């Protein structure tokens, strides 16, 4: 009978470390792909804070031809109404096509009640040429919670040649308001 001490095996420790780093790298890559189309924010007052999220996904992310470089939300309270402005910075990495329109969805959750308050589609006509970066923005006015968590998801990106991109998965926010699950449409 051969006894093997796993705790003292340098080779086994290195192999497990490589396996662990490889698995973590794949998970990070999958989440980074979803960051191209999904962001999560917390609003308490005027400005938003982007929240770290856990993303679970059924499918594989595809190449987009663009990157959601940055996104931010700003809120102005006007009595019982709140004006919410979303600003997206899009980088066009497609070598040939010009982006002409960006559409996104905001799912606004009441942080205190952990429930969906509003779902809003926003769109902006833009001209983002190949290799350039541009801004898409839109405003809404609605009765919104004082403290909210907002899930932003790109819905459609249209190009000048008539083609359009839309995600293969639709994402939703979990009950903990931190976990995003993406499922095939």
Model-derived regions: residue spans:
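Bacterial N-terminal signal peptides that target proteins for export
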Residues: 2-16
């Amino acid at each position: 009978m051969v006894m093997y001490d796993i705790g003292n095996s340098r080779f086994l420790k290195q192999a497990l470390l490589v396996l662990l780093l490889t698995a973590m790298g794949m998970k990070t890559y999958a989440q980074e792909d979803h960051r191209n189309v999904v962001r999560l924010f917390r609003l308490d007052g005027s400005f938003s804070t982007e929240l770290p999220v856990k993303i679970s996904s059924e499918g594989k992310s595809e190449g987009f031809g663009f990157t959601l470089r940055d996104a931010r939300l700003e809120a102005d309270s006007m009595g019982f109404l709140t004006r919410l402005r979303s600003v997206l910075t899009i980088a066009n990495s497609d070598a040939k096509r010009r982006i002409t329109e960006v559409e996104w969805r905001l799912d606004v959750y009441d942080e205190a009640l952990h429930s969906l308050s509003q779902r809003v589609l926003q769109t902006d006509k833009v001209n983002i040429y190949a290799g350039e970066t541009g801004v898409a923005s839109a405003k809404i006015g609605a009765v919104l919670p004082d403290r909210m968590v907002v899930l932003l998801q790109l819905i459609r990106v249209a190009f000048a040649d008539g083609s359009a991109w839309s995600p293969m998965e639709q994402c939703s926010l979990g009950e903990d308001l931190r976990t995003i699950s993406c499922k095939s449409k």
